A protein has these predicted regions:
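A binding-site-centric feature that preferentially detects glycan-recognition modules on secreted/surface proteins
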Residues: 1-41, 45-115
């Protein structure tokens, strides 16, 4: 089963460039509410990969490099959002978010878009 995107983004896209995941210790529902307040949507896996590669070139580190993971509400696998994390060697770990109500200090979320 492939990963599918909820958002179809084209052109310029803004996203967070902070290395450690923003919005940590929030649930899937809390992330959706936060992004809606900011006129943003959950980042897709494609946006996450592109932003992380750009961050590596510009700042020397991948997004979520080893210490945090990001929920990517814009991409889904078997009905639920996916999580992403990069390692220092550029390896990308993508997994399904198992519990929508789950939250930890090392798990955050990333958004895209903007006003």
């Amino acid at each position: 089963v492939p990963v599918t995107d909820e958002n179809q983004t084209s052109g310029w896209v803004s996203t967070e460039t902070i290395v450690d995941a923003p919005y940590r210790n929030t649930t899937e529902d809390q992330l959706r509410a936060q992004f809606a307040r900011e006129w943003r949507t959950g980042a897709t896996l494609e946006t996450y990969i592109l932003a992380s590669q750009a961050n590596k070139v510009l700042n020397g580190r991948y997004l979520d490099e080893r210490l945090t993971c990001s929920i990517l509400l814009g991409s889904r696998f078997e009905g639920g959002p996916v999580m992403g994390q990069f390692y220092t060697n550029g390896f990308l770990l993508v997994s399904a978010l198992l519990a929508p109500g789950g939250h930890t200090r090392s798990l955050g979320g990333r958004s895209e878009g903007g006003r």
